[in-house]
Amino acid sequence: MNIEVLKKEISEVYQTPILHQTAFWSEVKSNLGIKSKAFEFKIRNSDLYTNTGGRSYTVSDFLVLIQQLSKESTIAYVPYGPEIEPSEENQGRFLEELSEIVRSYLPSNCIALRYDLNWQSHWGKDDFCDDEGKWMGPPQPNYQEFHFNYNTINWNFKKANTDILPVNTIFIDIQPDVNTILSKMKAKTRYNIN
């Protein structure tokens, strides 16, 4: 896999509907004391996607937030990026190589690079539903790590104990009146809304 990565100006980040990957978000975070860096990358589509040949490339970018943890350490964080989603069997390898390249642009005291990906969950398939079609939730973290590290060289991906950004989205029909919507919710959910 060959990825070309270039640092770019925050103001040149591509427009996207993903708020956390915009120049605006970088400015918001800057006002909170969090620094940002932007990177553009180019990769051959045959390295990203299975059953893709030819010489076509994908060019995309992503924003990295750098937060001071202590006087001695920082952490780099990529919220909902990178946007492009490789085929499942190429995801770990792609993210590993991208991370290794970006590492040289990060502060020397950076202790981790965290991604909260906006990719389709591996665990949302029918295999993770019970006989009634209800989702059983994700597997144990060690299984998730094993699955994501598949096809990587260093096996360095670790599942975070908590998620920063929402990982599951629920759609609510807002056509009915408020009382009807609330009546369909569990009592604890209603309590947390009110």
Regions found by a protein language model. Name each.
Residues 1-19, 114, 136-153:
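Short N-terminal secondary-structure initiator segments
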Residues 1-32, 183-194:
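Short amphipathic alpha-helix that is part of the acyltransferase structural core
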Residues 14-15, 23-24, 29-40, 151-156, ...:
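Glycine-centered secondary-structure boundary/capping sites
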Residues 25-28, 62-67, 100-102, 152-160, ...:
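Intrinsically disordered, low-complexity boundary segments flanking structured domains
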Residues 31-136:
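Conserved donor-binding loop and adjoining core beta-sheet/short helix segment
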